[in-house]
Amino acid sequence: MPDSKYELLFLDFDGVIVDSTKECAALTWYAGKDVTNQTLSSLLSVVPDWFDQRFRYLRPYMRTLDDFLVSRLISSDIRVESQDEFLELRSGIDASAIEDFVQDANALRSYWSSHDYRTWLGSHVIFDGIHDLLERYSKRVYVVTAKDTESSQDILDHFGLEQHISGIIGEAHDKALAVNSICLGRYVDPRATLFIDDNIVNCVRVSGTGATVNWAAWGWTSLAHFEAAGSANLAKLEMADMMYI
């Protein structure tokens, strides 16, 4: 085994490796609208403050791109204090509306990344400590994310991190399955791996694989998530703790 604590490292992308709130909020606001005649920089600057605040408020409960639509449809005075409350709101949205939104959002992200590449990349920020962590585990790191693979790859390339990544599993709705599949393919016992995510649901599900699971407290979190992490006996990982992994 290499001279580090784990044989493989599994990392979420948004909220663990990169802060992409600005881009995700804009994507949600503009998806389905004809904005191709405007620059991305101008679009980013005029996302309504009230919507940006609502998106950030709900972000801890949104696991995948299809969840983002909730932030655009619910009233601003609705309060969400648990994952179950969020899922109840989401269940009230027609499945076809969600499907259309995801298609529109992916198309818009692809347009931005191909027509205004530098601005699109610049709307993302790498969290402190990630560079060093990836360097220590170079070629033993898998990104398991709900984000699409191409966008994740582009951002990693931009920040010079792609050299450390063994693979990206994009649009992953079942992260436990992804972890098990990679471990099987690499002949690694899941118990010799570490999974880091800022979403409580993902952490709980992956803990069933036998992998060591750390909940990233610097990601999209709320007080309810801190309480849920304690109830689920999840190990909390602070940004400053990454140097000890």
Predicted regions and their residues:
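Acidic, Mg2+-coordinating phosphoryl-transfer loop and its flanking beta/alpha structural elements
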Residues: P190, L194-A235
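Short, well-ordered alpha-helix to beta-strand connector turns
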Residues: Y6, S138, I165-S166, G210
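Substrate-recognition "cap/lid" segment bordering the active-site pocket of phosphatases
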Residues: Y142-L194, I200-G208
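Conserved Rossmann-like nucleotide-cofactor binding loop
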Residues: V16, E23, T149, V201, ...
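Short acidic-hydrophobic, aromatic-tinged amphipathic segments that line or gate anion-handling sites
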Residues: G167-E171, S231-I245
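Short, acidic loop-to-helix structural element flanking the phosphoryl-transfer center
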Residues: F10, I98-N106, S110-V143, A176-L177
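Active-site neighborhood of HAD-like aspartate-dependent phosphohydrolases
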Residues: M1-R63, V70
